Amino acid sequence: MYQRALQDPLSDTLRAIVLAGEPEPVANDLPEPRLPQPYIKVIGARSMLERTWERIERLIPAENIYTLVSERHLSNPEIRRQLSVRPPGTVIVQPENKDTCPGILLSLMYVRSRFPETGVAIFPADHFIREESWYIRYVSLAAQALADDPRRILILGVVPRYPETQYSYILPETLTDRSPSIAYHRVLGFVEKPHLSTAITVVRSGGLWNTMTMIFKG
């Protein structure tokens, strides 16, 4: 997979930022010590963060994948173990977690100071994705769309299977482009973790689950 990434033309034009800065451990019934969600091993021997790295490395080489963590994470031996395998200079430490937008901004400042012209893909670290090959295919298509028009800001949405109240939703507007594999819509707005009645309305009106995967340049 690593060799495939090196041969992909996106390897030189796209950097990834993985958001793993959640500050608080998650209460769960797993035998391992309580950890922030990205570092938990839900299935098998790899954590959600380790699965995220492996997934992205199908498209982008490891040295172009940056991971945002919180400083307090570094006091945990298991978290340090997981981070220790990353290439030098690719772990970004924020002094204090300030939620998603400041974390993205800090990471962008770090990456852009080194690669001013690069495209950037933002990935959550705590998503379990069953159909990983399809997911990476759509990330690749979105990256190609960015290369065709660098003014675009792209965010991946998924057609909901049911009205989930713990997810964020994208409200798509007009269809702007379509290929045999993917449709592009303008975004009308977002709905964050709605009540069930609102979630049902959003799904019926064509709302999409928000993967929180974003690709942009400017």
Q: Positions of the model-derived regions?
A:
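A secondary-structure boundary/capping signal
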Residues: 124-125, 217
